[in-house]
UniProtKB/Swiss-Prot annotation:
The protein's Enzyme Commission number: 4.6.1.12
Binding site for 4-CDP-2-C-methyl-D-erythritol 2-phosphate: 10-12, 37-38, 59-61, 64-68, 103-109, 135-138, 142, 145
Gene3D superfamilies, sorted: 2-C-methyl-D-erythritol 2,4-cyclodiphosphate synthase (3.30.1330.50)
Recorded family membership: Belongs to the IspF family.
Protein name listed in UniProt: 2-C-methyl-D-erythritol 2,4-cyclodiphosphate synthase
Cofactor note: Binds 1 divalent metal cation per subunit.
Length: 159
């Protein structure tokens, strides 16, 4: 059996030009949005990078350029579905995924189960294979000042 591990990280800053945020494929009511070329889903972006990294295929930006207008405001679930195809082509399966959302606001806990279900559905895995947790920075740094959100994701693949 062959194992591969990948790590992904993403961060987006808040903007008053949008309302509501999308994290893990779930829309969350908020008075600000996240600035991005796509929908700004920091969790899915980090997850994509983790899987692509584990496959040794670069990063999300290599496959979905942020200068390409076809990806302007696109639903990030599209990226994850495309990366699932890469995973299948390379004949790897997901053992587990562990995600950390770092945000002072809004609160993530009420949305985590919906996020897990959304990601499991796209990746065609069990919800139990995905863990999502959220933390704050105790009001330190740009996240603590509520200027943005960051995520870290680790995934383990096997063949």
């Amino acid at each position: 059996m062959s194992f591969r591990i990948g790590h992904g990280y993403d961060v987006h800053k808040f903007t008053s030009a949008k309302q509501n945020i999308i994290i893990g494929g779930v829309e969350i009511a908020y008075h600000l949005g996240l600035e991005a070329h796509s929908d700004g889903d920091v969790l899915i972006h980090a997850l994509c990078d983790a899987i692509i990294g584990a496959l040794g295929l670069g990063d999300i930006g290599k496959h979905f350029l942020d200068t390409d207008n076809q990806f302007k405001n696109i639903d990030s679930k599209f990226f994850l579905a495309e990366i699932k195809k890469m995973l299948d082509e390379k004949q790897y399966s997901i053992s587990n995924i562990d995600c950390t959302i770092i945000a002072q606001a809004p609160k993530m806990l009420p949305h985590i189960e919906k996020m897990r279900a959304c990601l499991a559905n796209i990746l065609e895995i069990q919800i139990s294979q995905i863990n999502i947790k959220a933390t704050t920075t105790e009001r330190l740094g740009f996240i603590g000042r509520e200027e943005g959100i960051a995520t870290h994701v680790v995934c383990l693949l096997y063949r």
